[in-house]
Amino acid sequence: MKVAIIGAGNMGGAIARGLAQGTIIPASDVTVADPFSGSLETLQADYPEINVTTENPKAIKDADIVILAVKPWLIDQVLSVVHLTPRQVLVSIAGGVTFEQLVKSVGPEQTIFRLIPNTAISQLESMTLISSRNASKEQEQLMLDIFNELGLAVLIPESQMAATTALTSCGIAYVLKYIQAAMQAGIELGIYPKDAQKMVAQSVKGAASLILNNDTHPAIEIDKVTTPGGITIKGLNELDHAGFTSAIIKA
């Protein structure tokens, strides 16, 4: 199974590195194309087994899976010079580019996947959304298997892609904003910035682990640490008075 990745930017490079660390696609079966040789040199310095090229058509020549890791406005331009064969699977990670738009470039018979990872993919901790068109159950499972090695992947209908992107791709920024705000509070209380960052980040990581590992509702875990008359309930009430929940929902 050979994979070509068009684009060696943040996402393309992270996917290539993740595949190289995984067990499904050998690094030697991954080819990355990018017009900027600097990005390719950095990638190959980390993973010498990965193949690199500045020519997109050369990258996809023998590929079974072609991953487009370019900005949405470059999709049509890239697809106009790379001509896919019917056996090749096209994977687009360009946000907002629909199957309808992709079909205009590659035709209605092509097997297509839309993927929305988030930036935690660089840490193999992405929440990746996957939708498919003209894909078999085996192809869908393969895509899930590949991206579950880069975090957690779920298969959803394209109609849910916009809403779920707000939870995952945008959501990671909202969590980081909370971390930043909590750090500022810690600094105001006299805690050194690096210490505050470590404390808050680990608390967020621990909270996520409670939900994922125990499969419980957040309200249950909140109740465990909310003592009547304690500081936690006072803080939670202050967040509610300030419109915290409403702001997250509206965002």
Sequence positions of predicted segments:
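Short acidic-hydrophobic, aromatic-tinged amphipathic segments that line or gate anion-handling sites
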Residues: N51-N56, V154-I156
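NAD(P)-dependent Rossmann-like dehydrogenase/reductase catalytic/cofactor-binding core
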Residues: A201-A251
